[in-house]
Amino acid sequence: DYIDISDQDLEELAVKITQSGINVEKVITNHIDNLVIGKVISCVDHPDSDHLHVCMVDVGKSEAIQIVCGAPNVREGLKVIVSLPGAVLPGNFEIKKGKIRGVESNGMICALYELGLEEKNDETYAKGIEELNSDAKVGEDPIKYLGLDDTLYELDIHKHRNNDCYYHIGFAYEIGAILNRRVVLPQDSFKEVNDSINNHFNLDVETEKCPYYTARMVRNIKIKESPDFIKRRLIRAGMRPINNVVDISNYVMLEYGQPLHFFDKKKLGDKVLVRDAKEGEKVITLDGKERILSSADIVITDGEKPVCVAGVMGGENTEVDDNTTDILIEAAIFDPVSIRYTAAKLDLRSEASIRYGKGLNFEYTDKALKRACHLLEKYADAEILTDIVKHDKVDKTIKTVEFSPDDINKLLGIKIDEEDMKVELGRLDFAYEYKDRKFTVTIPRRRLDIDPYVNDIAEEIGRLYGYQNLVSTLPVVPIRRGDYIGDVKYRKQVSKRLRRLGLNEAKTYTLISPDMAKLFDYEHKEKVILPNPMSIDKSVVRTSIIPSLLNVYDYNKKRKVKDILLYEVAKTYDKSYNEESKIAGLLSGNYISNGWNFAKKVDFYVVKGIVEDLLDYMGFKNRYSFTAGGVDDLHPGISAKILLDKKEIGIIGRVHPKILKDEVYVFEISLQDRPQVLRWSCG
């Protein structure tokens, strides 16, 4: 539907796809010899069984054949799938003539799952044979009749391509790049009735975790069976067809990667409020289970009560059923981190939550909404109201990157001229300008996996050029005597000094939670927030090391460790692309443990003595001073700022009791200012 590959050998195309970076794990075809459409011309009970039937089946030959069948739904006049003797079904199961309880059987009447096709058509047939429509022609290939004779690729899509290759149109663009062919998107249109959604519906969004929410209203829909092509494609994608309305929402999701949710408008009412859930709030989801929510979750409400766990599963109280006539179509974007957290917490990984958790492209959100309206008008007789209700706070920044051909060649280690690069960029559907031997490339919004860095563009050009075509070359590296240099050497010297002062080195994550990132924000720097983090606990790049050490303290305290003396030398980062080397310490309990009837407890002056020794060692003797108070997260009477030549370089003091009731002391010093000539050697 989206790209012409009729001239391609599908096995060879699978190799090309794999070479481009997406591994084709398996090529699945459904051809089975000796498989035909049959018609049951008689069906009687087996004389020696309470559940078997003896059937005479017309398979398009001169005479009907006798088959013993145990399916509860087999009956006279039914069109069925018949495996004749010699057919080999999945699992290397060969059909042979034989006797079942003394009665001859010359084949097998089949269900789809027995042919290696997951049974998704109707729960009624979960334990029965497949019932074909009356227009099925006896003797013909049932796989072809069902439209299931296509070839399937089972893909191993790497995480960094999950955003753009997890839906059919996105994967069509990938094949288009490989074959240098144009992708054709569906051209959707529909008529609108003379009535606006604004007359029936209001939208309010109160959470920042929903940057984009759109909705349209359709009315007078007719719930019925979906057209065959939609049912067949859903089955091949592993989904069970239900009815035309539900099937259309799933079909569009597979096309554009955009989950849609259909609310029964009459059950919903005239308002939608999107907000963070309240602690302990409850909702019964479509699977009939009660879910207990927290403030980390997002809910769609009717203004008061929840009607949907946003991005995860709809609510039972607004479910579309056979009596539904008017629906509200939701197409939205939710914070992927929040959705992944909620889905994991509720143990509810739906097709929608998987896609929301990967991040979405708002342009395809709009296209998916339009596509759904087109299909609902065509296959559900829907009347579409005018206007779209929209909440739009999504970041629409266009990502561009500038580079020269030499930049690409240096990264790939080969020579590709600029004309070939233009071809590769065109294949990728990347718009570009080329001037003064410089490319300026605009990255399509659908490619959420690509950041505006030349490295990402080089990777794209390289994989289309073919990594198998890259020539191996030895790197040119000058040989020199090994030694630590610059900042690394300096940090190692400082670290060694602190170990001699009795502290233990910690190595912590650079990423912390949003709540921890609010602590010790004394420099008030804008933080880097990851758009697609592993978890909420690791979603913000720290601007201070102290929150990380507090996490280590909490971990050790829970394991009954009383004396905790820690330091870390590491870098911090902010949104202005600044990185800063810092040293931080955390001390609690005894500085000197019991021995010879003597113990020294950690207090402010112990920590101040350590800091003074360190500053002297760093070459700052007689240049530093302390000024009391002024740090929000430290005890106002037991804290100070550290100054170097009257310039603030750090803090010291007891952690404020509002954060920790325990007596815990911390310090943090910037290592940006240091003597140009080091007077000690690194050990």
PLM feature spans:
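Long, charge-dense accessory insertions within large macromolecular proteins
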Residues: I3-D9, I17, G21-V27, K39, ...
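Short, conserved phosphate-binding/catalytic loop or strand-edge motifs used
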Residues: L148-Y153, E192, Y212, S249, ...
